[in-house]
């Protein structure tokens, strides 16, 4: 009879829970194998984008510890160390990997009875009511929410494999909702509401190298972007820069939370939720979960290095929202241009990846992976998505010569031209539809102005995929000189196709031709 294996409380160092891609295919591995074989792994294969986004931050923080890139006497020394590590391409030092994972072994167990990974064991007493495992899984409906991804109900909770639960735990900590939550009582004070996770509704951009080893090193923020101790409170009161699993004490839920004081806390310690998973008897699955508030106040803000920051009307900076209908290429100029013509900022992580700061081979293979979660600011989750760019070295390579920025500026002009053509086409189709469908007795300007009809939606669904293909063709050729006429011609073709069914009727032909000039003028303007 085979002996039962010892209970390791689902040790994340050795249990297979992180999906990765290699030349042999996809598989799942633990933290130890991930770091030891990172230079032989192509990249992560996490199917849940919000989990992939959060996991990248966790892994980059661990990589910083293992390589000592979490410390820096000055920026030049830090850049030199990273350059040498990338150039050697030998992977992470095995002894450093084992030393780090060994030091924090008990904190890297998903179901550890004392300090489970990224969880708060105090919730056993402070929050006796459970939230349900459905609440943990963002794709499952909970409470009275609508069913989108599967038929799950609160009356019948379906257990989740522990390997999957670890990923959903990370996703909740970074993208969790605000508003009502399972109540928690601390020192006699009971509250049942929380604020949103730090990345809620955001679009996160991560540099991607030829291997996971390169990707993790490229994803460690440079010293010039680190938050500094003392910015979130009186000098000398800020805690040391650490990850949650490294700290000896759990934070006081009723005290004001500390801000980020360095790269480690900036990457891993911005959560606003407290979570505790309830494992099944075999600890191979999660059968219940408690999700509640971690602090009564928001953490002090900081500039996340993986987000695009746009300037609002009042001059403040705000992270760009994730929009499922907006393709990655439309954000490309905001990724590559350091000066966009306003006070907006590209992701700070890209500022340290220009030519000369990393080896040439790594630079010429550099891509960007994007992870987005289209949500509102409270509880509604729409959909999540991921995308990747081709190599960006031609756009990121800049110098003091003005000619080096021509292609990057062309990307911006191309995107603006595509959006202008889309807006003009949509407006023209709305106008044509109103002219075609307005009753003769009400055929006056301003009537039924809100009705756009079905044409704009049909046209935009055809336009954006075709515009994306045309954009990449222009980028490949390195020429955006005639971008407006190119996208205008595409918009005109789609306008004609969508309105063709009514062109044979007098009223339809009149409506069609009356608005067609709005799109046709793009061709005239681009050639004038």
Region roles according to the model:
Residues 148-151:
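Beta-propeller folds
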Residues 153-156:
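Flanking scaffold residues of small Cys/His-coordinated metal-binding clusters
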Residues 166-169:
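Short functional micro-motifs and their immediate structural scaffolds
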Residues 161-164:
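Short Cys/His-rich metal-coordination motifs, predominantly Zn2+-binding knuckles/fingers
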Residues 1-144, 171-528:
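Extended alpha-helical scaffolding segments
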